[in-house]
Amino acid sequence: MKKIYHNPTGVKKYTGLIFISPFIVGFLLFTLYPFVSSFLLGMTDYNGISPPEFTGFSNYISMFEDEKFRNSLFVTFRYSVILVPLKLVISLIMALILNLEIRGMGLYRTIFYIPSILGSNLAVVIMWQFLFTGDGLVNQFLEFIGIGAVNWYGNENGSLSIIVFLRLWEFGSAMIIFLNALREIPPEYYDAAKVDGCGKMCAFFSITLPMLKDVIFLNLILQLISAMQEFNAPYMITGGGPMKSTYTIGMLIYDEMFKYHNSGYANAVSWVLFVITTVFVLLLFRFTGSHREGNQ
């Protein structure tokens, strides 16, 4: 009886493709297609109902003549410049504290990470609004120490401060990244520095910071991207006011898309935001790259 041998080579050839096909399909449907569609819609006059009408770069030209766009761009830049450095500093300080070998430190790490999980959901927003009302806990504390109550929602700086405070409260993600990096620093470095007479501050600036350079850069990029896309907090807490002082680009995109049904313009603004954020990230890469070459 003649034996039949099956050659598995043909099957093995397509096995890998079969396993990665769900990822490829998902990428094409949920990443590449929306990406290309958004770019094309940004060059049309489209209200979401009638067929889009190609207008070329008219949306981009009118964008830079739009006072709302210029204001939202300024607010987003101002917000990012204030928030990102503060969040990095607070996250690093908390990571240094939580890196200490103290009993129950695991519980403290969990507690400080919880705000990042909660984010800016409705319950957190209500709590935040209660804290900063005219007779809220924050103003009561300020009156107690003799500073006096502040009209947080009635002035531009106060409203932006509320948004910044809310996002600073969510320092847990950056803190965890710093904490993991701190635990990777060999303790022998600190022992050698101590033998050489280097104190804690000396060890921090000569060992800890240089060893955290890449992680600081990573957190800087992540926090910058997040800040440039800000929408939830100002939308739910201040509504962009007062006087559009918290009206970010994210809110402008939302209003143009769902309030004014100007989908073409909204997609164009989103692409400008994408390009600006990408340029900032590339500049940071260039700066850190040249800095490393200089150190070498």
Predicted regions and their residues:
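A structural signal for multi-pass alpha-helical bundles of membrane permease subunits
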Residues: I4, P8-Q296
